[in-house]
Amino acid sequence: MQFKILVVGKLRNEFIKAGVNEYLKRLLPFINIKIEFLPSFSELPEKMALLKEEEIILKNIKNNEFIIILDKNGEKLSSEEFSNKLFKLTTLNPQITFVIGGIYGVSENIKKSSKFLLSLSPMTFTHEFALLILLEQIYRAFKINRNEPYHY
């Protein structure tokens, strides 16, 4: 089982970098997560930016990967439901790849190529916060799955 997270944009906020590093460290006993930061084209008009980002995202996805797109219109799951779904998926798919889009999200083609759209919240988050929240929820999912203290 391997997780990869593709993130359009860089981490700029030091406190988020610290949080991301903390959760990556906490996750090491369970899984090694690879995070790839992809260039953002936010300075371009929306359609052009989405097309350029789509091209780069698709270059970083392999055919055997189960793709989960983070999208505010995706399925909304409780932490327990996310844990159950994640561990069911990993029994069938050794490679899970999460995609966090840039300021415009991801293109419709990327959404259509994914197997699952996941919403972290009805609210919109920056790519940085989305990454941190996703890592925390993955960590929580492992703790729930193992019946270990953390989730209350």
From Swiss-Prot:
It comes from the Bacteria. It holds the Pfam family SPOUT_MTase. S-adenosyl-L-methionine binds at residues 70, 101, 120-125. One of its GO terms (molecular function) is rRNA (pseudouridine-N3-)-methyltransferase activity. CDD domains: RlmH-like. The keyword rRNA processing applies. It is found in: Cytoplasm. The keyword rRNA processing applies. Keywords: Cytoplasm, Methyltransferase, rRNA processing, S-adenosyl-L-methionine, Transferase. It catalyses: pseudouridine(1915) in 23S rRNA + S-adenosyl-L-methionine = N(3)-methylpseudouridine(1915) in 23S rRNA + S-adenosyl-L-homocysteine + H(+). InterPro entries: Alpha/beta_knot_MTases, RlmH-like, tRNA_m1G_MTases_N. GO terms for cellular component: cytoplasm. Its EC number is 2.1.1.177. It is an enzyme of class 2 (transferase). PANTHER family: METHYLTRANSFERASE (PTHR33603), RIBOSOMAL RNA LARGE SUBUNIT METHYLTRANSFERASE H (PTHR33603:SF1). Homodimer. Specifically methylates the pseudouridine at position 1915 (m3Psi1915) in 23S rRNA. Belongs to the RNA methyltransferase RlmH family. This is Ribosomal RNA large subunit methyltransferase H.
